[in-house]
Curated annotation (Swiss-Prot):
Residue stretches in coiled coil: 69-401
Biased composition (Polar residues): 417-432
Keywords recorded for this protein, A-Z: Cell cycle, Cell membrane, Coiled coil, Golgi apparatus, Membrane, Mitochondrion, Nucleus
GO molecular function, one term: microtubule binding
Subunit and interaction comment: Homodimer.
Gene name of this polypeptide: mtus1a
Disulfide partners: none
Organism in which the protein naturally occurs: Danio rerio
Gene Ontology cellular component terms for the protein in this record: Golgi apparatus; mitochondrion; nucleus; plasma membrane
Xref: PANTHER family: MICROTUBULE-ASSOCIATED TUMOR SUPPRESSOR 1 (PTHR24200:SF7), TOUCAN, ISOFORM A (PTHR24200)
Family annotation (InterPro entries): MTUS1/CCDC69
Entry protein name: Microtubule-associated tumor suppressor 1 homolog A
Family recorded in the similarity comment: Belongs to the MTUS1 family.
Length: 440
């Protein structure tokens, strides 16, 4: 239907374009006729203007020359206008001819498309007929296949019933064979497991005895070495403490003696300086009195007095400077003694700290001995626990074997009926052998 409607629309379009072309041709023919008439009139006017007729009846021309010139100009203007219209018409004619040629080309193209569409329509109608024939044949084949399917289903149901009956018989036979096979295997495995359990029990008891003996020997060795170390540390501490104490006492005595000697020397020096100072003061007073007397005697010699006074002051300053230097030296010696005393105090503090460190080491050794005793108790408890765990594991292994036997009897379909099963021997399997107990 879509192709038919498309073809009808194309036909209508072709008809409309053809009608338009006919109208254009009619207009063009009318324009050509009008142009022909105008050209004929123009030629006639030109011939008339070129060949003027003689006056009829032999009468002279009564029109003045001015009116003749005006008529000529008027005709010239008319001719120019007609020429312009003719040119315009020629241009329109050329454009219309071009349009006509284009429309003719379009019409040819449309006719070619129309022919192609008609060919496609014929091909599609032929394909539709073939598809209908194929649909009819496929319907017949589908009915035939449905019939064959029903026949095969009935045959399959019969075969399935036979196979199910055969499978039930095979399962019953397999269950009986498995019961007999696993009963014999269970007896073999149980006997081997019992032998392996007895061996493991004997090995465990032997290992426990060896571990206990080793532990006792190690405990005795540790206790003896610990006691020896503690005694040696005590002796070293006492000897070092005595030596430090004696050296400290000697140094304190020496320091006290040096302090006493320095104090005595300093006190003697101070007394000597005091006596010297008193004697110098007395000398200075005597000198001042003497100079006062001399000044009274010789008031005119004031400059001499001043010079003598300056010299005496210089002597006194030199003496005072010497005394100050000596006192500085003594103070430096006292500072050195004080620093030495401070160093000795620091040595004493270090010795006391070392004494405390030795006491702390002794405490740590005592704590270590207590820790070793507690660890020994913990090891004994762990050995007891491991023996209990081994017993519990043996019980669990027996229970698992019993469950395995009962489970195999209850579900025989999951196991193949082949008698050559790859069963591990209980001596090589890791399920029946318990690992050796290692001390922590």
């Amino acid at each position: 239907m879509f192709f038919i409607s498309k073809l009808s629309l194309s036909n209508i379009h072709v008809r409309l374009t053809a009608k338009g072309l006919l109208r254009n041709l009619q207009l063009l023919s009318g324009c050509k006729l009008a142009v022909g008439f105008l050209a004929v009139d123009k030629n006639k006017s030109r011939t008339n203007s070129k060949n003027p007729q003689p006056p009829t009846n032999g009468q002279p021309d009564l029109v003045p020359p001015e009116s003749k010139s005006r008529n000529v100009e008027y005709y010239k203007a008319q001719c120019e206008k007609k020429n312009q219209t003719i040119r315009q018409l020629e241009n329109t004619l050329l454009s219309n001819n071009r349009r006509f040629e284009a429309v003719a080309v379009v019409i040819k193209h449309l006719y070619a498309e129309h022919d192609e569409v008609m060919k496609q329509r014929r091909d599609l109608s032929q394909e539709l007929v073939t598809l209908r024939e194929e649909l009819v044949s496929s319907g017949h084949s589908c009915e035939r296949l449905e019939q064959e399917k029903e026949d095969l289903r009935s045959a399959f149901d019969g075969v399935l019933q036979k196979v199910q009956e055969q499978h039930r018989l095979d399962l019953a036979d397999l269950e009986e064979r498995l019961k007999t096979f696993y009963s014999t295997e269970w007896e073999k495995v149980h006997q081997a497991y019992q032998e392996e359990a007895d061996k493991c029990k004997a090995q465990m008891e032997q290992q426990l005895e060896e571990i206990r003996s080793k532990h006792e020997a190690l405990k005795k060795e540790l206790e003896s070495s610990h006691i020896e170390e503690v005694d040696g540390l005590k002796q070293q501490f006492e000897e070092s403490f005595k030596g430090f104490k004696q050296s400290h006492e000697k140094e304190m005595q020496n320091l006290n003696e040096t302090l006493k000697e320095s104090e005595e020397t300093l006190s003697n020096q101070i007394q000597d300086l005091m006596t010297e100072n008193d004697s110098l003061k007395e000398k200075l007073n005597a000198e001042v009195k003497r100079r006062m007397e001399l000044a009274e005697k010789t008031q005119d010699s004031h400059t001499l007095y001043l010079e003598q006074e300056l010299e005496s002051l210089k002597v006194v300053l030199d003496i005072k400077n010497k005394q100050i230097h000596e006192q500085d030296k003594k103070l430096m010696q006292i500072d050195k003694l004080m620093e030495r005393n401070v160093k000795l105090d620091e040595c004493l503090k270090k010795l006391q700290q070392e004494n405390e460190d030795l006491k702390a080491r002794m405490d740590r050794h005592a704590a270590l001995s207590r820790q070793l005793s507690t660890e020994q108790a913990v090891l004994q408890e762990s050995l007891q626990k491991e023996s209990k765990v081994n017993k519990r594991l043996s019980m669990e292994n027996e229970e698992l074997l019993w469950k395995l036997h009962n489970g195999d009897l209850n579900s025989p379909r999951k196991i193949s009926p082949s008698p050559s099963l790859n069963l591990q021997s209980p001596r090589t399997s890791g399920m029946f052998s318990s690992p050796p107990v290692s001390p922590r």
